[in-house]
Amino acid sequence: MMAEPVITNQIETAPVANNGTAMAPYMMSVALFVGAISLNLMYDIFTPRNYPKNGRSWWASKISVLSAVGICQSLIMVTLLVKVNGLAPSSIDKTLLVTLLTAFVSVSIVMLFNLLFDKVGSFLMLIFLILQLSGSGGTYPIQLSNSFFEAIHPYLPMTYSIDAYRQLFGIGGSISMDL
């Protein structure tokens, strides 16, 4: 045993440049969701500026503002990560698409809960964020979590944004299954 040490052979199936690139999918998803919560806390989604003709026009007036901020947030985040931090996704267009969709989904979910439950909705979204932090498989494979988090994993939006980002930043696969 001592005379014949074990020789290992390491094979990297999805190499990434550094730990920051490996954590970027998780932190980008978290940033977009936290941004959606913050935006909904600051922007009054209840009081219309002008009295709307119907519910659809009221919704369109509110979601357009929230989506515009989400688009700005997405563009700023991707630009800074690429230009300042040196993030090198396989496709910048697909990265922007995933970021914009993630921002829109986050804003929509948070807005829905704020509309249904008022300020309690923001609190529920904080709890939902905590569940997503643990159940999305962002830091460690979900198989290392307990059965509760494995059970909720497929139902969490961050699960899919994190996987799509991983495809773009390291694996090089398709994002179509995550959209």
Regions found by a protein language model. Give the residues of each.
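Membrane-spanning alpha-helical segments of multipass transporters and channels
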Residues: 1-4, 9-179
